[in-house]
Amino acid sequence: MLREALRKAAAGEPLSEGEAERALETIMEGGASPEATAALLTALRVRGESVQEIVGFARAMRRFAARVRAPEGVVDTCGTGGDAKGTINVSTAAAFVARGAGVVIAKHGNRAATSRAGSADVLEALGAAIELSPEQVSRCIEEAGIGFMFARTHHPAMRHVAPVRAELPFRTVFNLLGPLTNPAGARRQLVGVFSAGYVRPMAEALEGLGAERALVVHGRDGMDEITVTGPTLVAEVGGGGVEEYEISPEDFGLSRHAPDGLLGGDAHLNARILRDVLSGEERGASRDVIVLNAGAAIYVAGKAPSIEEGVRLAEGSLESGAALAALERFVRVSRRLAGRGA
């Protein structure tokens, strides 16, 4: 099967969803050489991955994932990463603000690849236990209302791909698959992407994979989040189609900020900024971008009828202390489940 997929990809022909799915199954079963895997990923990158190929790859990767139990309506705020902007960990912080507003979160994430601090790095710096088993994550979601699924732990078959990805000097389809392969099966998502060109394709892929409601976003400043420096492109999935529009911070009563106000650093600095926002000590650009993204997550969860109402609930989560309490409970529960004490 992989040989035929390679032939078609090398000829510039698109793979069907089923062909892409079977090709990745072969790779993740260890049935492909590193050279064949690299050739396929390179050919797809040169031509540009189609929505059908992305969906097929995601279906295969989901099948090999270590599953996590979570209630209906659970939300993920995992993005693609890779915007190389050096900003704070917005989606990680937004997850705790949304949790403080009553949203159940199954956060999928990893260590940094192109930035200095990924979600796993920051959560670890905050004191959380991040390398929990699928059963432990399921219990964490049940007890704390939020769980973190470390990609390396929950996608063990990626060991057949990781060395090849490390050798290739460019992004591949796998940079898109993280948000599409949540091990808890989240069907409500806020997904940031690193390029405006992927906003609609990712939304169409999510629709093809059965998303109930999702927002795919890309800041005009290049952020893979909803930005507060200017407009953000949005593709919304839900209601039987994909709707594209643009939003700005002023639409939600928030200020526009200079890009420098969103800069972070290593995991420890980003963890400190996250905690400062959640505790109410930081009220500038960092707070506003976290509130806006949390508001979008609250809307995606169905807890608010609009992003604007979601932003109001996000502000309430911060002001009441619920967001900080959500972080502290997550750290405490994750450590106990990992056997590290409270």
Swiss-Prot record:
The entry's keywords: Amino-acid biosynthesis, Aromatic amino acid biosynthesis, Glycosyltransferase, Magnesium, Metal-binding, Transferase, Tryptophan biosynthesis
Binding site for Mg(2+) 2: 224-225
Cofactor annotation remark: Binds 2 magnesium ions per monomer.
Pfam family, one: Glycos_transf_3
Enzyme class: transferase
GO BP annotation list: L-tryptophan biosynthetic process
Record flagged with keyword Plastid: no
Pathway(s) it belongs to: Amino-acid biosynthesis; L-tryptophan biosynthesis; L-tryptophan from chorismate: step 2/5
Residues involved in anthranilate 1 binding: 79, 110
EC id: 2.4.2.18
GO cellular component: cytosol
Requisite cofactors: Mg(2+)
Residues that, per the record, bind Mg(2+) 1: 91, 225
Residues that bind anthranilate 2: 165
Keyword tRNA-binding: no
InterPro entries reported for this sequence: Anthranilate_Pribosyl_Tfrase, Glycosyl_Trfase_fam3, Glycosyl_Trfase_fam3_N_dom, Glycosyl_Trfase_fam3_N_dom_sf, Nuc_phospho_transferase
Binding site for 5-phospho-alpha-D-ribose 1-diphosphate: 79, 82-83, 87, 89-92, 107-115, 119
Alphabetized GO MF terms: anthranilate phosphoribosyltransferase activity; magnesium ion binding
Catalysed reaction, written as an equation: N-(5-phospho-beta-D-ribosyl)anthranilate + diphosphate = 5-phospho-alpha-D-ribose 1-diphosphate + anthranilate
Chain's role: Catalyzes the transfer of the phosphoribosyl group of 5-phosphorylribose-1-pyrophosphate (PRPP) to anthranilate to yield N-(5'-phosphoribosyl)-anthranilate (PRA).
Sequence similarity: Belongs to the anthranilate phosphoribosyltransferase family.
Assembly and oligomerization: Homodimer.
HAMAP family found in the cross-reference section: TrpD (MF_00211)
Name of the molecule in the record: Anthranilate phosphoribosyltransferase
Species of the source: Rubrobacter xylanophilus (strain DSM 9941 / JCM 11954 / NBRC 16129 / PRD-1)
Gene: trpD
